[in-house]
Amino acid sequence: MDFKYSDTVIHNGVVFYITDGGHRVYFLYGGCLLSVPRPHATAESGEIAKFGLTLRGLTHNDRVVANYVRSELNRTGRHESAPSSEEDVFVDRLEVLAQGAQAFGRDICGSFDLEVYDPYLAECMVSLKVTSGLIVSTGRDIPQDGMLHLYTVPTITNASSGFIYTPNIACFTLVQAYLTELPPELETLISGLFDHIPVARPPLRDESGGHSRTDIIVTSPRAVKTMAIGGTTRCSKRPLRKTVVSDFVQVRLIPKPCSIWDSASRVASGASLQSLQLLFKIADEIILIEEPWPGLDEHLNQARSTIVDAILAVYGNEGKLRFFGGKLTQQGVTTLQRFVLCQFILGKWNLINCYAALEQLAESYIGAVPEARDPLPDPHLVADAVNEIIRESGILGELCEIIVRYTQPTDPVNGSGSEVVELEARLLAEFAANATRVELGLSSYDEVRNMEARIASVLNKLYAKDGIGGAAQVACRILGSGLPVAIVLNVSSITAFDGLDLSRKGAYYLYYLLSERLKRGGVTVHVSRK
């Protein structure tokens, strides 16, 4: 859900978001969004509402996680904060648990991010054992658009490494709740707030008969569940038979997702080196520049935000997640440039990519800023950079398939210790087994773990900026064979511009890992069919 606001004000140390001409404010409370009207509002416009994710269970039919949070709140002495058995448990209760008995209303306000250090809750949310804690992000503020966005499914990252997990969607449900009154601590927090917020002057001819409704954009494909908290005249004791929308809400739009993903058939340049040179040069400018340039249409501007989400999913914040092309960073190649190189390779092989959207952004930017085109970077430098990525993914594919074919039940190889590498090693073992028609189900548990550990060792070398030489060196040691040296010679001859089978294999392994990272990062790859 998207919530439009016109301005912000800080009151009692908390940021409030002003909407509806000053008649209503939003504020963040433990990852949820509360909507509060101006005092003395009419019954129609005076509704207090709460929007946010609630905790459910391990499956769609149980409430294990919600019941656990209730019991923990009671066990730790926060009885007043524990919802009744009839009420859903909002994620703000997680912040109450994390901060303990000293937590006060203001301490829980102001952020979409929640910290979860309870090992049981962490495992329920991501289906993996986590010892370092989780950061659960329930939404984000987009100040340039004046918009607060609530996620249907949260983004969950490792509190230590920044690794992005795939959430257990059965654990969360987006809910709209009616509140008859605010808790006393929040009443105190907003006391005097509206004294500092002027009411927008209505037009001389106000045909609406009152102040305008608030625009809330519903983007979820599923209806938002509705519930009531406390007694209310508008809700009988009978359960609601359908989802209803708050009186102050006007659903204006259910938009299609911004479609940046496509096949190479729509790449205007045919994925040429010249187009790649231009994109390589201005990639950081067209994505990171804050203000839209003259002539940039709304769809392309929205595409920039979608591309940023994709880059964060693949490389993490500030590029902390290692990926192909790490060796290029030593030559000053940026994370955005590496992303462009990957999209070029995928476009060349008709795999789902966003290279056409990047080209359109570049064309629009050059139309507004012609001097940004020249001089183009050295074509040999750009070609070497994109070739490095296809060769790294190519040797990974070759070595993975050799490992799943010929791994023997020998002493296991030590893993890398990196969560992302170990997870991707498991995925690659299955992918390589399918490609070579090896039945992993016929192998023993120890054999499969040994395969995964060997793949992790190779992957770790590639991600650690050692390139194809480092990957071959570790492969020779763990396989006890010089075959990887011959593979290096073959891989060194492929390029991102040829049509060789080994190049195709590299593109497919690159696509598989990249698409899995997008999935874990919550980025939906919606393919245009226009």
From Swiss-Prot:
The organism's place on the tree of life at top rank: Viruses
Record's keyword annotation contains Electron transport: no
Protein name: Tegument protein UL21 homolog
Keywords annotated in UniProt: Host cytoplasm, Host nucleus, Virion, Virion tegument
Described function: May participate in DNA packaging/capsid maturation events. Promotes efficient incorporation of tegument proteins UL46, UL49, and US3 homologs into virions. May also play a role in capsid transport to the trans-Golgi network (TGN).
Pfam family membership, one: Herpes_UL21
One GO location term (cellular component): host cell nucleus
InterPro entries xrefs: Herpes_UL21
Organism: Equine herpesvirus 1 (strain V592)
Lineage, top ranks: Viruses, Duplodnaviria, Heunggongvirae, Peploviricota, Herviviricetes
The keyword Cell inner membrane belongs to this UniProt entry's keyword annotation: no
Quaternary structure and interacting proteins, as annotated: Interacts (via C-terminus) with UL16.
Entry similarity comment: Belongs to the alphaherpesvirinae UL21 protein family.
Localization per record: Virion tegument; Host cytoplasm; Host nucleus
